């Protein structure tokens, strides 16, 4: 591979297969989406109440070639037009990651293109750059099925995790509470919709932890909800599902928003970003907007299409690595437990 030519029009083909979405996108100059094709497997996993790794991998194998071709066609570009190929290298399900990584390596090798490995959470954060330019220092609240983190950034590619969950991630707690309420997988959207018609009458606990901590804990809340429902059932009492959803969500949002605002003030950030699958939650989006309405801090909330896993966000994050000439070799591998800091 010769020297990388920095064209005026930097086109990156990005691939995301870390969990149960097969996605490919073409991103121009790190900020413009030319295509973003996503094939979801939710229906295949719904009856199991969660993602089954073996099924996820099989779906990725079936879909990846078609999805990449569709993304290229929709963007109206050929492989010769590309500046690089990017792919999620972790964290995620190892089998699922390998499908995307091997597809990206094959394309990079066949067309002599630079290869860029991207951290999945960096992708979620950089989804916001597809809306507006990032302003540093900034704080990102990352909320998803597997992650709940507050990440401080002083510059591009510099990630400092200042708060994280000590047990369950937010999305995980949502799914478990939803299952107890008899709601289908994934539970987040169902609880969010139910909560609109309920009241915070049950006053579930808030885990604030130590006064100076930005960490989170949701296992106690999850247990409190399950115990409330179990005890009511034993007593033959009827608890309104809407009130359970509203009370659970009120507790989650209270802690997330309060800690985010406190961290934003303490770290004197210019921008706060919302990122991750749970960022699609209407209750959380509204609460953050209300909390930062009068603050001199720019709050950026991505559209729903960029909250859940997609390849456009991977392309946006990869653009920074492309400019820094941070490329991967053909030994790039899927890393299910990849750390974010100093990515």
Swiss-Prot record:
Main localization (coarse): cytoplasm
Gene Ontology biological process terms, A to Z: tRNA threonylcarbamoyladenosine modification
Entry EC no(s): 2.3.1.234
EC class (word): transferase
Domain of life: Bacteria
Cofactor(s) it depends on: Fe(2+)
Binding site for substrate: 142-146, 175, 188, 192, 281
Residues the record lists as binding Fe cation: 120, 124, 309
GO molecular function: iron ion binding; N(6)-L-threonylcarbamoyladenine synthase activity
Alphabetized UniProt keyword annotations: Acyltransferase, Cytoplasm, Iron, Metal-binding, Transferase, tRNA processing
Cofactor note: Binds 1 Fe(2+) ion per subunit.
Subcellular location: Cytoplasm
Catalysed reaction, written as an equation: L-threonylcarbamoyladenylate + adenosine(37) in tRNA = N(6)-L-threonylcarbamoyladenosine(37) in tRNA + AMP + H(+)
Matches recorded under InterPro entries: ATPase_NBD, Gcp-like_dom, KAE1/TsaD, Peptidase_M22_CS, TsaD
Any one of the GO CC terms: cytoplasm
PROSITE patterns in the record: GLYCOPROTEASE
Role noted for this protein: Required for the formation of a threonylcarbamoyl group on adenosine at position 37 (t(6)A37) in tRNAs that read codons beginning with adenine. Is involved in the transfer of the threonylcarbamoyl moiety of threonylcarbamoyl-AMP (TC-AMP) to the N6 group of A37, together with TsaE and TsaB. TsaD likely plays a direct catalytic role in this reaction.
Family (UniProt): Belongs to the KAE1 / TsaD family.
The protein's name: tRNA N6-adenosine threonylcarbamoyltransferase
Organism for this UniProt entry: Halalkalibacterium halodurans (strain ATCC BAA-125 / DSM 18197 / FERM 7344 / JCM 9153 / C-125) (Bacillus halodurans)
Gene: tsaD
């Amino acid at each position: 591979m010769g020297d990388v030519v920095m064209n005026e029009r930097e086109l990156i083909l990005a691939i995301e297969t870390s969990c149960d979405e097969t996605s490919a996108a073409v991103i121009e100059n790190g900020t413009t989406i030319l295509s973003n094709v996503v094939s979801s497997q939710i229906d295949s996993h719904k009856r199991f109440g969660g993602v089954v790794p073996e099924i996820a991998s099989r779906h990725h194998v079936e879909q990846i070639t078609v999805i990449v071709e569709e993304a290229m066609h929709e963007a109206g570009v050929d492989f010769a037009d590309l500046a690089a190929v990017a792919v999620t290298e972790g964290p995620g399900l190892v089998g699922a990651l390998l499908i995307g990584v091997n597809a990206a390596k094959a394309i990079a090798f066949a067309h002599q293109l630079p290869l860029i490995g991207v951290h999945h959470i960096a992708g979620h954060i950089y989804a916001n750059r597809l809306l507006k330019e990032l302003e540093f220092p900034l704080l990102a609240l990352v909320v998803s099925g597997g992650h709940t983190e507050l990440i401080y950034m002083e510059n591009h590619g510099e990630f400092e995790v200042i708060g994280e969950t000590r047990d369950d991630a937010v999305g995980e707690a949502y799914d478990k509470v939803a299952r107890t309420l008899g709601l289908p997988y994934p539970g987040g959207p169902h609880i969010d919709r139910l909560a609109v018609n309920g009241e915070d009458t049950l006053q579930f606990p808030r885990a604030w932890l130590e006064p100076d901590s930005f960490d989170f804990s949701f296992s106690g809340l999850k247990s409190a909800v399950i115990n409330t429902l179990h005890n009511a059932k034993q007593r033959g009492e009827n608890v309104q599902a809407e009130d359970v959803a509203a009370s659970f969500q009120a507790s989650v949002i209270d802690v997330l928003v309060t800690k985010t605002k406190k961290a934003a003030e303490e770290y004197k950030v210019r921008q706060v970003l919302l990122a991750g699958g749970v960022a699609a939650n209407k209750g959380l989006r509204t609460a953050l907007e209300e909390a930062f309405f009068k603050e001199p801090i720019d709050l950026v909330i991505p559209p729903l299409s960029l909250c859940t896993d997609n390849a456009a966000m991977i392309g946006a994050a990869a653009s920074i690595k492309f400019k820094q000439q941070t490329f991967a070799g053909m030994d790039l591998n899927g890393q299910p437990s990849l750390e974010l800091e100093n990515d």
